[in-house]
Swiss-Prot record:
Pyrophosphatase that catalyzes the hydrolysis of nucleoside triphosphates to their monophosphate derivatives, with a high preference for the non-canonical purine nucleotides xanthosine triphosphate (XTP), deoxyinosine triphosphate (dITP) and ITP. Probably functions as a house-cleaning enzyme that removes non-canonical purine nucleotides from the nucleotide pool, thus preventing their incorporation into DNA/RNA and avoiding chromosomal lesions. Shows very low activity on dGTP or dUTP, and has nearly no activity toward the canonical nucleotides ATP, CTP, and TTP. InterPro entries: dITP/XTP_pyrophosphatase, ITPase-like_fam, RdgB/HAM1. This is dITP/XTP pyrophosphatase. Its cofactor is Mg(2+). Homodimer. It catalyses: XTP + H2O = XMP + diphosphate + H(+); dITP + H2O = dIMP + diphosphate + H(+); ITP + H2O = IMP + diphosphate + H(+). Belongs to the HAM1 NTPase family. The active site is at residue 63. Keywords: Hydrolase, Magnesium, Metal-binding, Nucleotide metabolism, Nucleotide-binding. Coiled coil: none annotated. It comes from Archaeoglobus fulgidus (strain ATCC 49558 / DSM 4304 / JCM 9628 / NBRC 100126 / VC-16). One of its GO terms (biological process) is purine nucleoside triphosphate catabolic process.
Amino acid sequence: MYFITSNEGKFREVREMASKYGIEIEWLKMEYIEPQGSSLEEIARLSAEMLAEKVEGEFVIEDSGLFVEALKGFPGPYSSYVFKTIGNEGILKLMEGVENRKAYFMAVVAYFDGKEVRTFTGKVEGEISREMRGTQGFGYDPIFLYGNKTFAEMATEEKNQVSHRRKAFEEFFRWLKENKI
């Protein structure tokens, strides 16, 4: 089965999780224009349907986002674009002087089995830090606090124990084991 992503960090994270279930995942590095949608689930589903016309066989994709309570859920489904334009520095700037730092990461995995698309969701609650911390991970990891550490201060294995991506992929891997393998 392919995992379609242009993000090598995501692929490594998911391959490590899949191996614990005895599932082999191959990386299909592919750029694609992500459709716009009002939710991660809608974007993941539309992306999978679009890719199903180009990719033979079964595959999985994942879309994730950072949702900041004080910013009314922003950047949410626009997380990738926002990261490319204003990055972590921009989010920290928007949060200057804001006391409510609550945020969560959400991930939606969309699996295409050759016929239909199924989605699986994972979520992890945390806060936005006051400065960037850590060098591990990617994306918003340096500003997402889980307990007393940012995701970027955690080793991959530690982050994988609690991450939104892990929760979504574990739900998927369990379903796959019960229904397909």
